[in-house]
């Protein structure tokens, strides 16, 4: 009886070791098979990158960019492909390559990230005078993941922080006095932008002349995100009086 029990138990360590090995091999084979099925090379120049685009955060930016009017150029990058290319928007929100040299084509069937930005500013920009508008540096950025067999929709967001000031009469100040008021925004008057990412220039605080929207009676200015904690943010000059606003905690 003792011999029979030993014989009965003896195969199980071998079988128990065999099954996990077999399952591991099957798992590896399944993974390889799945990868082969999901990623396959595509013929060169056959599947162009298809793009549509919209501007998110549709708050009014009279001096900036809220919608496509046609002709705007956006810079585009495709994950896995070296370099950036230029696409041109139409008024319907469709993007097409600027020319044949600026066309992206899918290399395989795998998903990839598409990033885009406009305007393409690669140097330090002076933003101290925005009285004529700020569209030239109203940086928009978008990113999305897609495949070769579908159009990719890009939702552009504004990268710069926007400051709005509305003046109202009251407490001894008349509408006539407000018409002659001067509004000054404090902050870094320089900005850097690279591939849709913005940052302050030299970090020095300066004065920015805002854009005035007569229709909404708003003073508007764009600034790169920066820490203004404990620093003056807005100065309003009415006649010989200056009113300065400083917020204790603010990161714009």
Give residue spans per PLM region.
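N-terminal secretory signal peptides that target proteins for export/translocation
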Residues: 1-13
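Sec-type signal peptide cleavage vicinity
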Residues: 2-3, 17, 25-249
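Sec-dependent N-terminal signal peptides
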Residues: 10-22
């Amino acid at each position: 009886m003792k011999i029979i029990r030993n014989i009965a138990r003896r195969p199980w360590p071998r079988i128990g070791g065999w099954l996990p090995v077999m399952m591991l091999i099957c798992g590896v084979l399944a993974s390889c098979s799945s990868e082969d099925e999901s990623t396959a090379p595509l013929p060169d120049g056959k599947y162009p990158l298809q793009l549509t685009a919209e501007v998110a955060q549709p708050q009014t930016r009279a001096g900036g960019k809220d919608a496509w009017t046609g002709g705007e150029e956006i810079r585009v990058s495709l994950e896995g492909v070296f370099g950036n290319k230029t696409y041109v928007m139409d008024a319907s929100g469709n993007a097409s390559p600027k020319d044949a040299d600026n066309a992206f084509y899918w290399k395989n069937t795998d998903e990839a990230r598409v990033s885009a930005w406009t305007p393409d500013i690669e140097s330090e920009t002076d933003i101290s005078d925005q009285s004529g508008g700020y569209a030239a540096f109203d940086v928009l950025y978008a990113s999305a993941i897609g495949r070769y067999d579908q159009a990719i929709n890009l939702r552009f967001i504004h990268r710069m922080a926007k400051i709005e000031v509305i003046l109202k009469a009251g407490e001894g100040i008349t509408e006539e006095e407000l018409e002659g008021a001067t509004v000054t925004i404090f902050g870094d008057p320089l900005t850097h932008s690279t591939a849709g990412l913005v940052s302050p220039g030299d970090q020095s605080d300066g004065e920015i002349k805002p854009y005035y929207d007569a229709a909404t009676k708003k003073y508007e200015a764009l600034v790169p995100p920066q820490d203004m904690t404990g620093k003056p943010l807005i100065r309003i000059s009415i006649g010989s009086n200056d009113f300065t606003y400083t917020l204790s905690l603010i990161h714009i």
